Amino acid sequence: MQTSVIGFPRIGTLRELKFASEKYFRKEIEAEELQQIAETLRKTHWSIQKEAGIDYISSNDFSFYDMTLDTAVLLNIIPKRYKELELSGLDTYFAMARGYQGASGDVKALAMKKWFNTNYHYIVPEVEDDTVIQLSGNKLVDEYAEAKALGIETKPVVIGAYTMLRLCRFTGKKPALDYVEDIISAYQNLVKKCEENQIAWVQFDEPALVWDMEAVSYTHLRAHETLMN
């Protein structure tokens, strides 16, 4: 029998991530120190799973704020008002999560919703008419490589294409159907990148399959089947 976990709590035994993030928001530490604390947490969590004998250890399950937001950034789903702030990648991410008021501008955070009737709230990705959904980030591969350098083989975890489309809010005139081909192409490129980096397993989470199907959802699901094939 082989064992796997779908993901690992990211906050830390002593809530290290929470406290470090709050220090960063108060400008008490630099981004480099926050990233170092995050790296230490990932190493600890992978090591715990390895020592417990887990066969399929997860990576890319770490997040500074929310995995849905992580996936949105991975797919270049970043509204213009946040890009126009011209902040660092990390600060743009936090602006989407928390809002931003400073020298670069004043924007509110993206909306939040309950994650499938749980008490967890996710950041709702916002797709504009001119949003180009494409693979635009290396977090998944980078964290796999980080674990590999420690001698730990992992399976990256990522929210799947079908669920991402169902979770997105479309703010323009274009419906979700107009983005099906682009999101499938982005995920195909993600799979190719995984193959190029000798990643044997990838876990695509599709919790939206528990929802009732709408007419548009059947098209999404067929597109998802195309990706899987």
Model regions: which residues?
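A short, hydrophobic C-terminal helix/tail in secreted or cell-surface proteins
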Residues: 223-229
